[in-house]
Amino acid sequence: MIRVICNNETVELPKGATAADFASKIKNSHYFAGVVINDQIKDLSTTLNEGDTLRFVTFEDSEGREIFLHTSAHILAQAVLRLWPQAVPTIGPVINQGFYYDFANLSVSEEDLLAIENMMEQIVQEKLEVSKKTFNGKEEALKEFMHNAFKAELIQELPEGESITAYSQGEFMDLCRGPHLPSTAPVKAFKLLRTSAAYWRGDPSRESLVRIYGISFPTTKELKEHLHQLEEAKKRDHRVLGAKLDLFSQQECSAGMPFFHPRGMIVWDALIGYWQRLHQLAGYKQILTPQLMNRSLWETSGHWSNYKANMYTLKIDEEDYAIKPMNCPGCMLYYKTRLHSYKEFPLRIAEIGHVHRYEVSGALSGLMRVRAFHQDDAHVFLTPEQVEEETLNILNLVSELYSTFGLEYHLELSTRPEKDTIGSDELWELATSALERALINSNTPFIINPGDGAFYGPKIDIHVKDAIQRTWQCGTIQLDMFLPERFELEYTNAQGEKSTPIMLHRALFGSIERFLGILIEHFKGKFPLWLSPEHIRLITVADRHQPHAKELAAAWQKLGLVVTVDDSNESVSKKIRNAQNMQVNYMVTLGDREIEENTLAIRTRDNRVLNAMTVETFINTILEEKNSLSLTPLL
C-alpha cells in the first residue's frame, strides 16, 4: 500500500494505483480533467507514489480548463485530417479565449467550419480513449513523425535527454507534452469561430498556414452563454466605437500606432490627469526620459542581447541607437544623477513613457495590440525591510484606481522559476514572503502561480474583469533584483556603508492605450461624465436662440466642462438623436420659454426627459458629478 494526501487527508491506495483509480472512488469524478501532483499538472492516468500530494482539477479550474481546451484542439486536428487527409498539422495551443490549430497544405473557408464541427461531434460520440506515449529518445520520435517536417523541427530543437511524448486518440497521434483528458467524451459543446492566415512560428519568411479558432465547454448551456458574450463583445468592440465616437483612428502609414482625435484626447487627458493626481497624493515624483537612447544603455540593461528583435534601432553618427521598448533603463539613469540615502526611501519615481515594441502585423488589433503605446511605469527604490509595507501601499493604490472605474480584479503571485534566476535563495525567500504577506494583509483574494515569476524576482499580476465578465491582464508589481545591480545603483545605508537598493517596478494601467480600449468596451462607449469627451450639448430651437446658447457654453467651459452648441438647421429631434448617438451625457434644448424663464430643458443620452431646472441647479449638479468621479448620473 501507499499513502497519498488529498484535501489535507491521508488516503491509503494499492501500490501502482493511478490518479484515475483514486478518482473513481470520489463523487462526481467524471468532471475531473486532470490532477495536480506535488504542484505539477498531470494526466489522470499518472501512477501515484508514496507521499504524493494531490489536487483534482475540473473545467472550473484554470489548469483543468487548459487540459479541456487542449484536448479540444486535438479533436479539431483529428477532424480536419479525416476530412482533408493531405493537411499537415503543425501546432494547436490553448489561448485566452479558446484554442486554435495551424495547418499546412490546407485550404478551407468559413463555410467549411460546419463540416469540421460535424466531424468533431462524431469523434466525441466515439468516446475515444486518449493515451500517452513516451519515446525512447529523438530518433524514435523522428521516425514516428518523419512525414511531418514541422513536428520534426520541434523534436530536433528539444534538449538532449528531455522527455518526448505524444498523445493518441483513435487513428490520430500528436506530438505533445500534455496533459489531456482521459477520452474525447467530455467535450460535449464546441464551436469553431473563424479561420485566418498564419505563418509557421509567426515568421513571415516561413511557411504559410491556415489557422482555425475554436472554443469548447462541458455543457451546451455554457457554450450558449459564451457565444452570447461574444455577440455582446462585438457590440462593444472598441475599434467600432472608437470610430463611431470619433475617438481614434488607424492609418496604413503607421500600422499599430493609433491616431488620437480631439474627442479621444479629452478622454486621454481626463485619464492621465486622474492618474497624476492619484500618484502625487501617494508620494510619487514624475519624470520623463528620452525615447531614443544609445546602444550602450541597452547593453547594460540586457535588452540588446535579449530583446533586440522587438526593438526599433537606427544609426546616428555611426553609432547604434534604439527607441525605448521599456521605461526602466531611463529611470536607472535618473537615479544615478545624485547620491541617495536610506532616509529618503521608499523613493517613488513615476513615468508615463512612450514606448515602441515590434509586433507582427497580423497580431495588431486596435488599441489592444499595438507597436507604440504609453506605459504608466513607476520604480520604487527601497531597502529589503520595506518591501512588504510598500507592496501593501501599491496594492491599496491598485484598489483605489480600479474601483474608480468600477472594475473588479483578481491578483496572481508568481514565484521563482526553477532555472536561470539571479539572486540568493535567501533573498528570493525574503522577497516572495514579503509579497505574499502584503497580499494577505490587503484582504484581496489571490492565487499562486508556482515558478511563473521573472528571472529577476517574483511578481504580482493584476487581472481586470469587465462588464461582460472578460478578464484582461493589465497592471503588474515586480520585485527587481537585477537592474539595480546591472546599473550599479547605490545608496548609503544606516551604517554609513554603500548598498544596492531593492526595486519594485509597477504599472497600474499597463499600456494606457490598451486600458482605454478596455474602458471603451467596459462602458460600451457610455463614459461616466468625468471621462466623457462631451459633457453637454446645447441644442437651439431657432437661430434667435444661438447667442444665448453660445453665452452659456462659454460660461460653462470656464468651469472645466466640455460643452458644444448644435446650431445647425436640423430639426430638434434630429439634433437630439445625433447627440445621443455620440453618447453625449446631457442635451440641453433652448427655446423661447427656456430663455424667458431662465430654465433648461434637459434630456439624457438614455432618453430620460428631466424636469425643467434652473441653470444654477443644473451646473452645480453636473460639477458635483464630474468632480466626484461618479460612475452614475446624478440627474
Curated annotation (Swiss-Prot):
<keyword id="KW-0820">tRNA-binding</keyword>
<comment type="similarity">
    <text>Belongs to the class-II aminoacyl-tRNA synthetase family.</text>
</comment>
<keyword id="KW-0648">Protein biosynthesis</keyword>
<dbReference type="InterPro" id="IPR006195">
    <property type="entry name" value="aa-tRNA-synth_II"/>
</dbReference>
<feature type="region of interest" description="Catalytic">
    <location>
        <begin position="237"/>
        <end position="528"/>
    </location>
</feature>
<feature type="binding site">
    <location>
        <position position="505"/>
    </location>
    <ligand>
        <name>Zn(2+)</name>
    </ligand>
</feature>
<dbReference type="GO" id="GO:0005524">
    <property type="term" value="F:ATP binding"/>
</dbReference>
<dbReference type="GO" id="GO:0005737">
    <property type="term" value="C:cytoplasm"/>
</dbReference>
<dbReference type="GO" id="GO:0004829">
    <property type="term" value="F:threonine-tRNA ligase activity"/>
</dbReference>
<comment type="function">
    <text>Catalyzes the attachment of threonine to tRNA(Thr) in a two-step reaction: L-threonine is first activated by ATP to form Thr-AMP and then transferred to the acceptor end of tRNA(Thr). Also edits incorrectly charged L-seryl-tRNA(Thr).</text>
</comment>
<keyword id="KW-0862">Zinc</keyword>
<dbReference type="GO" id="GO:0006435">
    <property type="term" value="P:threonyl-tRNA aminoacylation"/>
</dbReference>
<keyword id="KW-0694">RNA-binding</keyword>
<keyword id="KW-0479">Metal-binding</keyword>
<dbReference type="Pfam" id="PF02824">
    <property type="entry name" value="TGS"/>
</dbReference>
<dbReference type="InterPro" id="IPR012947">
    <property type="entry name" value="tRNA_SAD"/>
</dbReference>
<dbReference type="InterPro" id="IPR002314">
    <property type="entry name" value="aa-tRNA-synt_IIb"/>
</dbReference>
<dbReference type="GO" id="GO:0000049">
    <property type="term" value="F:tRNA binding"/>
</dbReference>
<comment type="subunit">
    <text>Homodimer.</text>
</comment>
<dbReference type="InterPro" id="IPR012676">
    <property type="entry name" value="TGS-like"/>
</dbReference>
<dbReference type="InterPro" id="IPR002320">
    <property type="entry name" value="Thr-tRNA-ligase_IIa"/>
</dbReference>
<dbReference type="Pfam" id="PF07973">
    <property type="entry name" value="tRNA_SAD"/>
</dbReference>
<dbReference type="InterPro" id="IPR047246">
    <property type="entry name" value="ThrRS_anticodon"/>
</dbReference>
<dbReference type="InterPro" id="IPR012675">
    <property type="entry name" value="Beta-grasp_dom_sf"/>
</dbReference>
<dbReference type="InterPro" id="IPR004095">
    <property type="entry name" value="TGS"/>
</dbReference>
<keyword id="KW-0547">Nucleotide-binding</keyword>
<dbReference type="InterPro" id="IPR018163">
    <property type="entry name" value="Thr/Ala-tRNA-synth_IIc_edit"/>
</dbReference>
<protein>
    <recommendedName>
        <fullName>Threonine--tRNA ligase</fullName>
        <ecNumber>6.1.1.3</ecNumber>
    </recommendedName>
</protein>
<keyword id="KW-0067">ATP-binding</keyword>
<dbReference type="InterPro" id="IPR004154">
    <property type="entry name" value="Anticodon-bd"/>
</dbReference>
<keyword id="KW-0436">Ligase</keyword>
<dbReference type="GO" id="GO:0046872">
    <property type="term" value="F:metal ion binding"/>
</dbReference>
<feature type="binding site">
    <location>
        <position position="379"/>
    </location>
    <ligand>
        <name>Zn(2+)</name>
    </ligand>
</feature>
<dbReference type="Pfam" id="PF00587">
    <property type="entry name" value="tRNA-synt_2b"/>
</dbReference>
<dbReference type="InterPro" id="IPR033728">
    <property type="entry name" value="ThrRS_core"/>
</dbReference>
<feature type="domain" description="TGS">
    <location>
        <begin position="1"/>
        <end position="58"/>
    </location>
</feature>
<keyword id="KW-0030">Aminoacyl-tRNA synthetase</keyword>
<dbReference type="InterPro" id="IPR045864">
    <property type="entry name" value="aa-tRNA-synth_II/BPL/LPL"/>
</dbReference>
<dbReference type="Pfam" id="PF03129">
    <property type="entry name" value="HGTP_anticodon"/>
</dbReference>
<dbReference type="InterPro" id="IPR036621">
    <property type="entry name" value="Anticodon-bd_dom_sf"/>
</dbReference>
<feature type="binding site">
    <location>
        <position position="328"/>
    </location>
    <ligand>
        <name>Zn(2+)</name>
    </ligand>
</feature>
<keyword id="KW-0963">Cytoplasm</keyword>
